[in-house]
């Protein structure tokens, strides 16, 4: 059996009348009644006897209710059939509405959670049901865990809207049965290239919570800077950009706690052995190599890094593993998640030419290759990482298993994050039995299409198109962005990443992450670079991109994501505009094709 599309959404949407709300991500099953609006009493009171010891449910409800009351949300972009246009006018039938009797006002939110002790770890049950009945004064939420209850609240926030007269309503009785397609749904934040402040990190977590993303992959450091304090080697933060651009232990705890309160796991990444210069060299300069080399775009065959600045851990130097082990243990102690990302991407062989330890190791046995060197890292570093605890699960970039100089044997219990060659590498990794996080750069890299950041680049100094018939650097080419073009929300949403996988292979896909590499990102633009495009991924991995008949629902998604962008902004997330406001107010008037089934 072959899976021809990303798991067809099991979503069922039934409605006897039109409603304005259009929650994102779309629930798996939602059924609307037709008896008329359910008004909200002065305050919806939470009733539950099943909360966690630290009050996760109560705190989340308080935040949700405060948001509902403060916003008194009016949907900014509602769904409607495409309008009639000249020269093909269509008569408009007179509309009529039957009168509807008033129903009981809603006064309570009753929440029942089966397992209040379930920890926020990979695979935890996030399902919930939400029911608003015609003759009831209670919104009923049932969830297997508190984390499912939190998702119910974020759905409810989008269902309760202004009645236009100062009150609040839910437009019709509604029944929702919801759960995610994939357990791993994330974005990646890079704070190694540019520092991102705590308030801005919190802002991303708000967007994630509203869209039901549940993993913040935190790429903490890179060759350019080491921004996190570690007690064991306090000198490492000498390579932070400034004393004000350091994450303290308390900062990390605040980020983790803020995320957990919203059902979001924080998975740290320390990229090793490549992308490693800052921080490490302060502990022992001998444990890093090629840090003082020119990265060498001038003579690419000799390059020591794919971008400035170079630096890698010395794989053969014994003390490397002592220092790495100490840093890893300390960071593992302050991040409660069972998963830890240990990098493994873009190892540059030329960098090791600057290491006397590595060159001597090669000289001792001329049959040795860079594959053997990568395997040396796996054999010596991975046991240190895995032995932290029985629950520990490692994540690595695919390069360690698939690059030109990959290791021979990478344990199958390591999760591979796939970023190159799209469907080809996904198929390769899953066929070999690896669990895979999809981060294909052709679809999910959010920094793509913004040009290059390296300066002194003569390629831009061209005043006329040198070849009008062939795309080139400044004329139809990538303009310095290696992964151009820009990934629009439609590009992200349309990604069928299980295409042509067998059923067995498809089971190895645990989810997806949209990375935002930080070379051109800081506090000023981080939110607009993530949002609302990350919301397209959120729906893709929550309920899919197809309807119950297997048809792509990108056209249907349009008004939903346009409305959600406005909702993000109303909640303090500085999401980028996607279209002229005219398009929000005129459903599908900005479609490329009048044919509403143009996308298959």
Curated annotation (Swiss-Prot):
Active site (catalytic residues): 222 (charge relay system), 275 (charge relay system), 346 (charge relay system)
Thermal behavior of activity: Stable below 45 degrees Celsius.
GO cellular component, one term: membrane
Keywords: Carbohydrate metabolism, Cleavage on pair of basic residues, Disulfide bond, Glycoprotein, Glycosidase, Hydrolase, Polysaccharide degradation, Secreted, Signal
CDD domains named among the record's database cross-references: GH20_HexA_HexB-like
Marked site: Important determinant of glycosidic bond specificity: 306
Activity control, per UniProt: Activated by non-covalent binding of the propeptide to the catalytic domain. The concentration of the propeptide is regulated in the endoplasmic reticulum and the propeptide thus regulates the amount of the active enzyme at various stages of the growth cycle. The dimeric enzyme has about half of the maximal activity in the presence of one bound propeptide, but is fully active with two bound O-glycosylated propeptides. Inhibited by N-acetylglucosamine (NAG)-thiazoline.
Site residues, Not glycosylated: 525
Glycosylation site residues: 78, 83-84, 318, 353, 387, 428, 500, 525
Catalytic activity: Hydrolysis of terminal non-reducing N-acetyl-D-hexosamine residues in N-acetyl-beta-D-hexosaminides
pH profile: Optimum pH is around 5. More stable at alkaline than acidic pH.
Disulfide bonds: 290-351, 448-483, 583-590
GO MF, one annotated term: beta-N-acetylglucosaminidase activity
GO biological process, one term: glycosaminoglycan metabolic process
Main location: secreted
EC number(s) stated in the UniProt entry for this protein: 3.2.1.52
Signal peptide limits: 1-18
Subunit text: Homodimer. Oligosaccharide moieties may also take part in the dimerization. Dimerization is a pH-dependent reversible process. The individual catalytic cores dimerize and the catalytic core of one subunit in the active dimer interacts with the propeptide of the second subunit.
Protein known as: Beta-hexosaminidase
